[in-house]
Amino acid sequence: MKTPLAPTKSNLAYVRDQLGLARDGYRLLEQKREILFMELTSLLEEVHLLETELDKRRKQAYASLWQLLLAQGRDDIAACALVTPVPCRVQQEVLLIAGLRFLRLDAVMQPPKLQYAALGSSACMDRAREDFGLLLQTLTRMASVQTIVWRLASEMRKTQRRVNALSKQIIPQMCETCMYIESVLEERDRESTFVLKSLKARKDPTTTL
């Protein structure tokens, strides 16, 4: 505590109360930091797995597209794409981590409403559509998890700064203030005791100081 306080019993009680609150806050922030760290570690492992899956899905999707180009040509593919929308629904899941609210998104692919067999398509079209749908699902999941990771990392940095401020500045300053007030009050008590004994000694010469 940078502001000096008068060394009184009431101020000592006040500082002790504040010190207790600061220590409680420190323990709660430590618990929050540990929870954030565990969740962040778990999500980083998930990101690593998603990166591997994403690389696999991307290679498979573009391989299917290449096969489709060889089988049907660019013009037929463009014609099918114009008349065949690919429905995609986004699911939202609310996650609560250490009192924080996050949204996790997942893309759910649905069968196309219009069949395009009459346009001269082949099984390659179905395979390419399916592979790119899986790629979109993985991309959506990856973006969602990475956003949560970024927010968790940001929150963890803020929590760590608060923990450091409490442990290295606020709590030590409060302890120092408590010790200062206690020492002054003890010195006053000793002086008061000495004065009382001196007064008694004057009244009764047999009294020992």
UniProtKB/Swiss-Prot annotation:
Q: Which residues cross the membrane?
A: none
- State the UniProt keywords alphabetically: ATP synthesis, Hydrogen ion transport, Ion transport, Transport
Which is an annotated Pfam family here?
ATP-synt_D
According to its UniProt entry, the protein's GO biological process terms are:
proton motive force-driven plasma membrane ATP synthesis
What GO molecular functions are on record for this protein? ATP binding; proton-transporting ATP synthase activity, rotational mechanism; proton-transporting ATPase activity, rotational mechanism
Q: NCBIfam families of this UniProt entry? A: V_ATPase_subD
Q: Which PANTHER family does the protein's record reference?
A: V-TYPE ATP SYNTHASE SUBUNIT D
UniProt similarity note:
Belongs to the V-ATPase D subunit family.
Query: HAMAP family of this UniProt entry?
Result: ATP_synth_D_arch
User: Could you tell me what this protein does?
Assistant: Produces ATP from ADP in the presence of a proton gradient across the membrane.
Q: What's the protein name?
A: V-type ATP synthase subunit D 2
Q: Which organism is it from?
A: Treponema pallidum (strain Nichols)
